[in-house]
Amino acid sequence: MKKIILASSSPRRREILSRFFDIIVHPSNVNEDKIKEKDPTETAIKIAKAKAFDLAVKFPTDTIIAADTIVTLNGKILGKPKDSEEARKMLKQLSGKTHEVVTGYCIISGDKIIEGAEITKVKFRELSDDLIEWYISTQEWRDKAGGYGIQGFGAILVEHIEGDYYNVVGLPIIVIIKLIELGHKLKRIF
C-alpha cells in the first residue's frame, strides 16, 4: 500500500489526518507568498497544488496530500498576522461579521490528481476590546490565517459556523473521504 505523505508543517493538519491514517509528514519548500490569484479559492488551490507537486517528484510511488487555508472578509484575504498589532486589527475587522475560510487541497496518487476547495462561513460574535486583548495574550493567533484558531481559545470568538468545522481547523473531511476512495484503509484504533 502506498504511504500517505502530508506536505505540510501544520500541526493541525497532521493531527486531523493522523486520527484516520498512518502518515508521514514532509513539508514542501514552496514559497506561498509568490502565488497570488484574484480569487482566494483559486489561490488556495494553486498553493496546494504547488506543494503537492513539489513532493510528488520526491515520492512518486506514494500518495501526497497538500492543503492551504485562507481567511477572507468581503473578498479580502486575511493572512497570518506578522505581530500582535496586526492580529488585533484582524480580530477587530472580523468582530460581529461573517467571513469565509477557504481550504484548497490537492491529492496526488500515481496518475490521479484530485483537487478542490472547501468553504466554511464563520460568524464572529461582537468582540469587546477586553476579549480581543485577552485572546492576543494567549499567543494563539500566531501562525493562524485570520489571526485565530477555532480549535482552541479562539472558539470563544465564534458565534456560529456554516459548513465543515475541520475545514476551519485546516483540513476538510472531504480529503479523508477522497483517501478512502483511493483505497487507503482507515487505521485501527482499538
Swiss-Prot record:
Top-level taxon: Archaea
Catalysis performed (reactions): dTTP + H2O = dTMP + diphosphate + H(+); UTP + H2O = UMP + diphosphate + H(+)
GO terms for cellular component: cytoplasm
Keywords assigned by UniProt, alphabetized: Cytoplasm, Hydrolase, Nucleotide metabolism
EC nos: 3.6.1.9
UniProt record, GO biological process: nucleotide metabolic process
Protein name: dTTP/UTP pyrophosphatase
Cofactors: a divalent metal cation
Primary role: Nucleoside triphosphate pyrophosphatase that hydrolyzes dTTP and UTP. May have a dual role in cell division arrest and in preventing the incorporation of modified nucleotides into cellular nucleic acids.
Cellular compartments annotated: Cytoplasm
Major localization listed first in the record, in broad terms: cytoplasm
A GO term, aspect molecular function: UTP diphosphatase activity
